[in-house]
Amino acid sequence: MPDTSLLPQTTSPLAREMRSFTGLFTEKTFDWDAFPASRGFPDLARAQLRYIGAGGSPKSNDPSTLKAEHFTFSLVNQPVGKFAASHAHEVVEHFMVLQGVLTVGTVWGDEVVEVKLGPKDLLLNKSGRPHGFRNDGVEPVLMQITVGSGTPEMPVHVCHPKNKDLELSRRFGAPGPEKIELFSPESADRRHLELGKHVVRHRDRVPVWEKAGFARMTYVGEGGAPAHGYSMDMIHLPKGVAVRPYVREVEDAYFVLEGALTVGWEQDGEIVERRLGARDLIFNPAGRPHYFRNDGVVDAQFTMVVGSGKPQPVTFEAA
């Protein structure tokens, strides 16, 4: 890895481009009016913070949001006691909890199977499968949401308080408690079997240690939830570990969960770097040589989202 410590501190076109592909958490603002269908319904209150694309919001013209290609990336803050009405997308959508406990209801007609997700747990919602979510906990839920299209259609609501009873909507359309089941991975019921393929528990992830010195845990892709249009790994990067520049045929994005991450781009012999902290993101375009390194005093953890559901021929080499 070239020594960049003595590089001139001028702002080059490449550095400006890299900055334009970076979303810093402290420079962003949660939008409490991101979802028009929630207007006028206090029980549906939630806030969205957009990094890549608009997600389930129609606000695709947000100048602070990076243009999406194969997936969107956003955070959602769900206050205690609030819920999102059951709805369906034409593409897959995942929820990964960062803070709190989220209850997700998956809908089969008038029957609902609920699953609780804790920190670093993920649920991938199938395309066309109605689902909603609710915060029954004692602290706000912060979750990361990715939709498997750069320009997803607006969701289709199945049970919404604008035309259904409020409590019915809170139960995601289940007429009563007898129509609600808690997800069981041991159940032979077809609904539980379907959910079992799409629920990813952090505690069950088995790390795969790469020769480059970091660990990879698959969340979406082979060994995790089925990939449709994108894949996602959680990367554990010990302090002092670095990888050499690599190139993909599609875009990838890093979102820092813990610690600090140094990311570098290369072009025509020029090298530029940015350091990211918790909840910062960088979008690395297809064909761009890029690398990552942990210069911090503690191990770093970040998610890596790749704009293809197919295995990518990338070999990581230690720097």
Descriptions of predicted regions:
Residues 1-69, 161-229, 244, 317-319:
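A short, N-terminal "cap"/entry segment at the start of jelly-roll beta-barrel domains
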Residues 54-61, 74-89, 216-218, 233-248:
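Conserved short histidine dyad/triad with adjacent acidic residue
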Residues 61-67, 83-89, 106, 114-115, ...:
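Short histidine-centered beta-strand/loop micro-motifs
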Residues 75-76, 86-88, 92-97, 115, ...:
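His/acidic/aromatic-lined binding-pocket segments of jelly-roll/cupin-type domains
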Residues 79-80, 90-108, 239, 249-267:
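Glycine- and acidic-residue-biased ligand/ion/polar-headgroup-sensing regions
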Residues 82-85, 103, 123, 127-133, ...:
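Histidine-centered metal-chelating micro-motifs
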Residues 94-96, 123-124, 138-157, 253, ...:
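A short hydrophobic beta-strand segment most commonly corresponding to one strand
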Residues 108-127, 267-286:
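Short acidic-glycine-tyrosine-enriched beta hairpin
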